[in-house]
Amino acid sequence: MEDFIYYNGKKYRKGYTTGTCAAAAAKACVEMILTQEEVSAVQVTTTGGTILEIPVAYQKFSKDKATAAVQKDGGDDIDATHGMWIFVDVDLTDNAEVVLDGGVGIGRATQKGISVAVGEAAINPAPRKNILATVRESLGENRGAKILVYAPEGEERAKRTMNSNLGIIGGISILGTTGIVTPMSDEGWKKSLSMELEMKRNQGLDQIILVPGNYGDDFVQNTLGFSSGNIVSMSNFVGYMLKETQRLAFKKVLMVGHFGKLVKVSAGIFTTYSKDADARAEILVANLALLGAPLSLLQAVEKCNTTEAAGEFIEEAGFTQVYDVIVQKIKARSERFLKFTKPSVEVDVVTFSTERGLLAATKDIDVLREEWR
């Protein structure tokens, strides 16, 4: 993939996700069945709308069945799945239904709290939708297909991911909110985020919305209804980006993100990589204890691998006020972080859950809408 971001004159090449690999391999399968010819490359539209030409690394086909593989290319972001082959089998059917499942090397969800139901293959919603749509577009409306995604190296590669901590067992996940992998080289990536902030400031904006990533971006636009023109990604660099807003003299910052990401800031963790600091359960337990939560709830929350899973216990026990307490602590920590440098920056916070929607905000949402319209 020949697309880049730049830092200090050096190019960082972008790549494509496992979800894009699976969609491309699935399309190659359908094309080979329909044409009865080998396919060496396919054009696919990613979940984010980017059109890519993807090489096909392996091809095999017969009258109603085909197998194809695409090699994962993460660009200059060398993650656990970079270079591995993502295989897809497609069997055509006559019932007009297109179904998708995962095979060898694709993990299975064993716990609640993630975006995949217990027992299902770990194919996230966005790539699942994209794979099905890609096959339907190539196949037409009158034929159906059974699609199986698998990765022979998946179980071994998954040991280098956080899947087991999330209750995903047996392999990798098929991921990709946008379908594109953007290199996360820290210095280069932080510089690119700063450049976007500078651009917004130069356009005359004096207040900015910081989000960790695509989920926060979607929530701001689709749930809160705020303008996309105020949004900048902070990735995992919360402290760095807060300092940058101060350097650039923004007056107001609104941080909007999934609770599992922002909860860390309430305890003074300003770089939110899970590999660097993951105290989500401990922070929740401490705050619940201060609210007088029973020991049984504290023990249940401590055992949870995700804040989504913990949310079920918290809601059942009637302690959802913990979210209000924590967002106020996120605000206080952030403003204290900026306290000793001028100019002052007002920080507000909105957190949400994938399953439960809005959890808490430092101001009434209608007040925030008025301030940020």
Swiss-Prot record:
Keywords attached to this entry: Cobalamin biosynthesis, Methyltransferase, S-adenosyl-L-methionine, Transferase
Annotated pathway: Cofactor biosynthesis; adenosylcobalamin biosynthesis; cob(II)yrinate a,c-diamide from sirohydrochlorin (anaerobic route): step 6/10
Catalytic activity, EC: 2.1.1.195
Record GO biological process: anaerobic cobalamin biosynthetic process; methylation
Cross-referenced InterPro entries: CbiD, CbiD_sf
Claim: Methyltransferase is one of the keywords in the record: yes
Reactions accelerated catalytically: Co-precorrin-5B + S-adenosyl-L-methionine = Co-precorrin-6A + S-adenosyl-L-homocysteine
Main EC class the enzyme belongs to: transferase
GO molecular function: cobalt-precorrin-5B C1-methyltransferase activity
PANTHER family listed in its UniProt record: COBALT-PRECORRIN-5B C(1)-METHYLTRANSFERASE (PTHR35863:SF1)
Family, similarity comment: Belongs to the CbiD family.
Protein name per UniProt: Cobalt-precorrin-5B C(1)-methyltransferase
